[in-house]
Amino acid sequence: MNTQNNKTHKKTTSLNHKHSYRKLRRWVLPAVLGAALSTLAFLPTFAEDILSAPPTGNPPMSVPNGPVPKAEANPNTFTGTTVLTENKAIAHELISNTTSDQNAFIGKDKAVVTIENSVFDKTGNTTSDDNSNFRGQNAVILGIDGSQINIKGSNITSNSNGSNAVFATGEGSVINVENTNIHTKSDSSRGLDATYKGTVNGKNLTITTEGAHSATLATDRGEGTITAEAAKLTTSGEGSPIIYSTGNITADYITGEAKNSEIGVVEGKNSITLTNSNVTGYKDNGFMLYQSFSGDAESGIARLKAENNSLTTHATGAFIYVNNTTAEVDLTGNAISTPNTTTLVKAAADSRWGKTGENGGHLTLRASNQALNGNIVADAISTIALDMTNGSSLVGAINTDNTSKEITLKLSKDSTWTLTGDSYVKSLTNEDTTGDNIHLNGYKLVVADQ
């Protein structure tokens, strides 16, 4: 997640990135091995045994190292220090767990649990990245089976790989956490996490993660919903953005810092909505919207909506980077700072994901009452449609090398564009028929359709 673990159907080059980014993706055996393995399917121990010898003959490519991937576990089989299946109130408790693949606390069977002023701690590394990332095994607090867990005034910590702090999985499973401190120290250990239509709502939180692949707010396989309000969010690990969404994540009035990653990432047909917040990222790009085709996120339109925020990236990439997907971005009234890059928007293929020649980015960017500074670029298989309204402004060049497949621009009468370099667009729709809202500044503007 969070760039968080690995995904199937990826080239080796993408595996290296995803390891540093999100998930340790699972190896997919070549087709010739799949045929050989199918002959062993009747063996009762197949799901747990590793083949002792390879099949005869020469496969078309080398066999990846590592165990055969297993099916995700059923969360009902998970064990923990405290497992509640009925309604209960807990206060002033210390609940900890030190055993691998166990949870400190599990709520299940539609239990309604209230927890106040308690301490939860988890150590003991996961032995299954899939189970911990997708189903919440080894998390500190886990909600399943339509349970509702309400947490107030507590402390939640973990120091083991694959130990997410607060994890809800399965439709109807809801965790509400308020006035609570959360701190995870190891890899793949996110703050608030939801999968398979689970929901986590947070308010007045301090969340700190130190490990790689450990976003403070995250959703993963099967989608999930996260809301966060009035939270202080800090990540320091590689591939640990403040927000990583393969579901729907909404954050309001947060302060956030990703010391070794992007501000936010949207994968597939999912969304981030960010309002009234102050967030900063330091690596790669400001925001990335993409599709990995790993199976964790459905294909469709990736969406980012940001309104009334302070958005800062110290990265050298683009403020917004779109690849291998169709995306829609709405920017309204944000203060955007990009001190180390002149690239505002980039839509382009990325060799780590998708099929060569078909993995471009396709972005619709709507700006309302928004000041934009920087260049807009796209490669030969990518497109950008920029729509500026309500007094928006752009200071920058568009497609200055004239290499993009297509970039179009719409300007309302009260919006302006000041060129900083020669620019080439497919079409220009301007409500100001005099063109006085476009300042060439000595540069050339070429409109292909005119």
Pin down the residues of each PLM region:
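All-beta strand scaffolds that present successive hydrophobic residues in beta-strands
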Residues: 84-92, 112-117, 148-153, 174-180, ...
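N-terminal segments that cap or nucleate solenoid repeat domains
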Residues: 48-128, 445
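Post-signal-peptide, soluble extracytosolic/periplasmic N-terminal scaffold domains
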Residues: 90, 107-185, 193-202
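Extracellular beta-strand/beta-solenoid scaffold signature
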Residues: 70-79, 99-106, 128-142, 160-168, ...
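Extracellular, surface-exposed repeat architectures
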Residues: 441-450
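Surface-exposed loop/turn positions within long extracellular repeat scaffolds
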Residues: 399-406, 419-430, 449
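Sec-dependent N-terminal signal peptides of Gram-positive bacterial secreted proteins and lipoproteins
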Residues: 25-45
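Bacterial Sec-dependent N-terminal signal peptides
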Residues: 1-32
